[in-house]
Amino acid sequence: MGSSQSTPKVQDANADAERIRKAQHSMAAAGGGSQCPLTPEQRAAASGENCGAGGACPVGADKASINPLNNELEHPNQKPAPDQPFALPTKREKSTIPKAGTETETWTYPSPQMFWNAMLKKGWRWQDDSLSKSDMENIISIHNANNEEAWREVLKWENLLHPECAEPKLKSFKGDAKNLSPRARFRNLFLGYDLPFDRHDWIVDRCGTKQVQYVIDYYDGGAVDPSSKLFTILDVRPAVNDIGNIWDRMVVAYWRFKFETLGFTPSLPIPPTEGHNVNH
């Protein structure tokens, strides 16, 4: 009979995966995302400096140098921080997410170096997470994969409920881990769900006819895949800040009850993802 004990290689892979999960939680708690956070007062005091070598965002950055769509410097800091323990790539990858206001352009992800610098600025302490260069690159891969998955979930809502717009595009986004959504609070208080460890808000341009806010809650799915390091479960849905969004969510809730609870057929042509895979 085979041994039930895991091999050292498997144990190392599991340890790497757990370390990466812990780091992602602490990064989200520090602010999440890759933006340089600036207060209105700091923006008003603009003086044209760039982010320093340590990843600090300028107290007086030129207003024109800040992209209001992602609160990121137009020429972001790619220099290593003074106490950085290893070099990180500065190459940025293109996403598949179409960018509003352009014909064919897509959003570009931050490089590992940009991500590191932004996290330091938000108060993250890399010493607490003992990350390696490989860990950091895996975190970037997970970050990008989560964004791609979130966009696919947005498209399920848009394609099902608003097929008149052939190509919705992402206009802007921000991370806001400390601002729990009403849905997340309700699930935690009354249904016993864990709280999400991160939250993002995306503004989607619906072919120029409307700008729609989507809320994305990031839940810890428990088991970490040792190969992909993925562990996040996404809850993607329109925000309840507009009568149209509320109606869309009511329609989807009705369809889910009709087809999934009562067992009516046919099922939804594109399964909506409100609460998709968030199992507790």
Curated annotation (Swiss-Prot):
Span list, region Disordered: 1-95
Organismal lineage: Eukaryota, Metazoa, Ecdysozoa, Nematoda, Chromadorea
Main location: mitochondrion
UniProt keyword list: Heme, Iron, Lyase, Membrane, Metal-binding, Mitochondrion, Mitochondrion inner membrane, Repeat
Family: Belongs to the cytochrome c-type heme lyase family.
Native source species: Caenorhabditis elegans
Compartments reported by the entry: Mitochondrion inner membrane
Enzyme class, broadest EC rank: lyase
A GO cellular component annotation in the UniProt record: mitochondrion
EC code: 4.4.1.17
Paired cysteines (S-S): none
Record's protein name: Probable holocytochrome-c-type synthase
Catalytic activity, reaction form: holo-[cytochrome c] = apo-[cytochrome c] + heme b
Primary role: Probable lyase that catalyzes the covalent linking of the heme group to the cytochrome C apoprotein to produce the mature functional cytochrome.
